From Swiss-Prot:
GO terms for biological process: cellular detoxification of fluoride. The gene is fluC. Belongs to the fluoride channel Fluc/FEX (TC 1.A.43) family. GO terms for molecular function: fluoride channel activity; metal ion binding. It comes from Shewanella sediminis (strain HAW-EB3). The chain crosses the membrane at residues 5-27, 70-90, 95-115. Fluoride-specific ion channel. Important for reducing fluoride concentration in the cell, thus reducing its toxicity. This is Fluoride-specific ion channel FluC.
Length: 124
């Protein structure tokens, strides 16, 4: 039960952080390119790499993993998890799996956004 509270706390922090960064980038660069999303994905990927590496070289408590890895980064972006998993595939020599992971994530996610939009727009 404790870990659930850590996930919830991290999630609320990550969601607020994402919102504030997105607003900041929108004000700074306008809406011609999704710089806010790019920024949170890049930051989230960096933080995921940091947390993963810290867990490899030292003891990271389950509470910290829940707070930062699942909660904060989960709310900030799931792209960090995707990036970490892809890098692990590459580092293990599974280049073909890494390629398919990249291709499937990009293609399927873009398609699902399209599908979701079409579902909504077709009902309006």
């Amino acid at each position: 039960m404790n870990n659930i509270l850590f996930v919830a706390l991290g999630g609320s922090i990550g969601a607020v952080f994402r919102y504030l960064l997105s607003i900041f980038m929108l004000q700074l660069f306008g809406s011609a390119f999704p710089f806010g999303t790019l920024l949170v994905n890049v930051i989230g990927s960096f933080l995921m790499g940091t947390i993963y590496a810290l867990g490899q070289v030292s003891q990271v408590s389950p509470e910290i993993k829940a707070l930062v890895g699942v909660g904060l980064l989960g709310a900030l972006t799931t792209f960090s998890t995707f990036s970490n998993e892809t890098l692990l595939l590459i580092q293990s020599g599974a280049w073909i799996k890494a390629f398919f992971n990249i291709a499937l994530n990009l293609c399927l996610c873009i398609f699902m956004v399209y599908l979701g939009q079409q579902l909504v727009f077709s009902r309006i």
